Amino acid sequence: MQGLVRAILRDLCLLNPDKPVIVAVSGGPDSLCLLDVLHKNSYPLIVAHLNHGLRSEAESDAWAVRREAEKRSLHFVLGEDDVATFAADNALSIEEAARIKRYQFLFTQAEKFDAQAVAVGHTADDQVETVLMHLLRGSGLSGLKGMPIRALPNSWSRDIPLVRPLMSVWRTEILNYCREHDLKPVIDQSNLNTTIYRNRLRHELIPNLESYNPSVKQVLYRTTQILAGEFDVLERVVDQAWESVLLDQGKSFVALDAAILERQPVGVRRQLLRRAIAVLRPELRDIDYESIERGLAFLAEPSQTNQIDLVAGLRLMLEGDRLWLATWAAELPSSWPQMAGQDSLRLGVPGDILLPAGWRLRASKVAEM
């Protein structure tokens, strides 16, 4: 296992042995194994741990991680957050809120310490569980290819990669490593709670699938590798199409050439719309199939108001051959008159009215022929 991870660190994670790495350590087997392997490969490490404020054992977990850092003479940073309040305020599940807060903390530390990467302890088992979750939610190729070993750009940074050195290692190998090297991970009892969706997959669905095929996890893992390669091919096609279809872009809007977009194969159209959404909502995961198909249907047959509410507070609007994806509050470039679809104005005939950005709408009677 150590030889495999060493090669991944060098060849796939592309880590420099001389620059700091933020290593996320919860204290569980996966992250403790990651810490130990990185340390034994002499990477300069900063051990980062976030107390989510959710479990009574949280403080003792933080102390356990601190001791592991001190044992190796490594710098330790501790963050604390109120995940439950954040989840309630943003209508998120506790699991999703914890994930967001954890990565925000990790990448804040990475910027603070000028780290070359953030390393997390995702394993091959995590990959299988993630892909199953995406499959059951109706994800496309981008979801079924799973998590990359090195992600740059990612939802948290365009400059600092997120790396997963243990992605090719199975959980059984992790547990064996911990035993062989006398590592004492903390045990998070919430991982046994099957009311949590991922835990239910891990403890109920996957064992059930293994009764049909004992190697189902290995099969699913290989499938992610195949799909990741095919996705790379598709991405190159989409990169070229993006250059021709993108007309304008700002912090709160993306403008696409509707005519060129419609001429693309449907698979490329889907990916172009996904990319436009990702530009404005980089943190958004698992863009659902229905939203993408609704966007493409709107492109083919616009609604009466020429705009629809698409996803995550974004609207899609068609203006001539220009397809806008924008936040509802976006101020669009004034090459065309802008008027929210739900507004109405009274226009006398003859008469004129002023529109935003200096535009004037004028009506006149045409003499009958």
Residue spans for each PLM region:
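Core alpha/beta nucleotide-donor-binding catalytic domains of modification enzymes
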Residues: M1-E210, R236
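AMP-forming adenylation/ATP pyrophosphatase catalytic core
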Residues: Q2-D30, I46, L50-H52, D81-V83, ...
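A broad structural signal for alpha-helix termini and local helix breaks/kinks
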Residues: F113, N213, I277-R281
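Inter-helical turn/loop segments and adjacent helix faces that build the functional surface
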Residues: N208-V219
